[in-house]
């Protein structure tokens, strides 16, 4: 009788383990089906930039499978000049529309000193949530290649699931 009880408990534990594994797998499939995914579309220097700051308007497109909510780009990001020395680029204004449905663009406006060179690599990070409130971040590497602010994407940043 004791042996049967032991086997029964082992079967129950194995069943419980399988159910938990199936549940995790289903949750991951659901998460991936809702995951927003930003791609860099373009950037340009805004012509009404004041005399001390250069204003850079950057556009990203949500090409994921779900909407992105509570979009918050970093307040600052580090940029590297061609000689590998660093300077800071700051967010110039608050996000005008913190929601990007699939196929919609999201605009981020940054600024940096007018004295900086026109050729540099920046690494902005964008944080956002999906439909279920899961938090993500995506860090891009973008080369600004001329005085007009035209950008070239260097990496294909994947959304990373953030810990709470």
Regions found by a protein language model. Name each.
Residues 65-75:
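Short, hydrophobic/aromatic beta-strand segments
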Residues 51-57, 105-106, 121-122:
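Short, solvent-exposed loop/turn segments enriched in Ser/Thr/Gly
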Residues 78-116:
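Intrinsically disordered, low-complexity Pro/Gly/Ser/Thr-rich segments with frequent PxxP/GP/PP motifs
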Residues 118-133, 137:
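Serine/threonine-enriched low-complexity regions used as flexible
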Residues 131-164:
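Acidic, serine/threonine- and proline-rich intrinsically disordered appendage/tail regions
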Residues 62, 75-79, 126-132, 144-146:
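Beta-strand elements of well-folded, non-transmembrane domains
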Residues 1-66:
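Membrane-proximal alpha-helical anchors
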Residues 34, 38-43, 47, 73, ...:
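Generic structural motif
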